[in-house]
UniProtKB/Swiss-Prot annotation:
NDH-1 is composed of 14 different subunits. Subunits NuoB, C, D, E, F, and G constitute the peripheral sector of the complex. Its EC number is 7.1.1.-. It comes from the Bacteria. It is an enzyme of class 7 (translocase). InterPro entries: NADH_UbQ_OxRdtase-like_20kDa, NADH_UQ_OxRdtase_20Kd_su. Belongs to the complex I 20 kDa subunit family. Keywords: 4Fe-4S, Cell inner membrane, Cell membrane, Iron, Iron-sulfur, Membrane, Metal-binding, NAD, Quinone, Translocase, Transport, Ubiquinone. Residues 172-193 are annotated as: Disordered. SUPFAM superfamilies: HydA/Nqo6-like. This is NADH-quinone oxidoreductase subunit B. It holds the Pfam family Oxidored_q6. NDH-1 shuttles electrons from NADH, via FMN and iron-sulfur (Fe-S) centers, to quinones in the respiratory chain. The immediate electron acceptor for the enzyme in this species is believed to be ubiquinone. Couples the redox reaction to proton translocation (for every two electrons transferred, four hydrogen ions are translocated across the cytoplasmic membrane), and thus conserves the redox energy in a proton gradient. Binds 1 [4Fe-4S] cluster.
């Protein structure tokens, strides 16, 4: 039998019968999802007039920091939510995709406004008809430009979506990457319509 000079925690009274209620039990997935949804760091990709509405959301009247998104980053390496706000042209599409590729995993995308979602009123040869042609979009915000309340609703929708993910199980299973995260080629040539 091995003896040590260390006291037994049960004999010293450090852990008693009342200690059971003082612990929080959770799964690893729930803990990771809670951390992710309460610390979303957006990166606004302001391409036109919708970017002004995003500035209004960050002000004190709407208080984006209530949702853990007060740290607006303009560096893709420090952000995990890209908010594409405005018209995406074919020339700008390659730059948007490069910035998306520089963001670390996990990352999410919000298409803000009618122009980012569907091309909006600009149905022409030079405008990409929806940013979902080059990026996997998680949440769409309608409107031209959308109201600040709609942007807050999109963040809440993204937070609900994060509750359903299983990051620890995906990590330990070593699954293949999802099709939505696969690289999407960008056609930089003008369409022949």
């Amino acid at each position: 039998m091995v003896t040590t000079n260390e006291p037994n925690i049960y004999e010293t009274g450090v852990l008693d019968s009342n200690a059971e209620g003082n612990f929080v039990y959770t799964t690893l997935d729930a803990a990771i999802n809670w951390i992710r949804k309460n610390s979303l760091w957006p990166m606004p990709m302001g391409l036109s007039c919708c970017a002004i509405e995003f500035m209004a959301v960050a002000c004190s009247r709407y208080d984006l920091s209530r949702f853990g998104s007060e740290v607006t980053r303009f560096s893709p390496r420090q952000a995990d939510v890209m908010i594409v706000a405005g018209t995406v042209t074919y020339k700008m599409a390659l730059a948007v995709r490069r910035i998306w590729d520089q963001m670390p995993e996990p990352k999410w995308c919000i298409a803000m406004g009618a122009c980012a979602s569907t091309g909006g009123m600009f149905r022409s040869y030079s405008v990409l008809q929806g940013v979902d042609k080059i990026l996997p979009v998680d949440v769409y915000i309608s409107g031209c430009p959308p109201r600040p309340e709609a942007i807050l609703e999109a963040l809440l929708t993204l937070r609900k979506k994060l509750d359903t993910q299983q990051p620890a199980r995906t990590f330990f299973k070593k699954e293949e990457p999802r099709e939505a995260n696969a690289p999407v080629p960008v056609n930089t040539e003008m369409p022949l319509e």
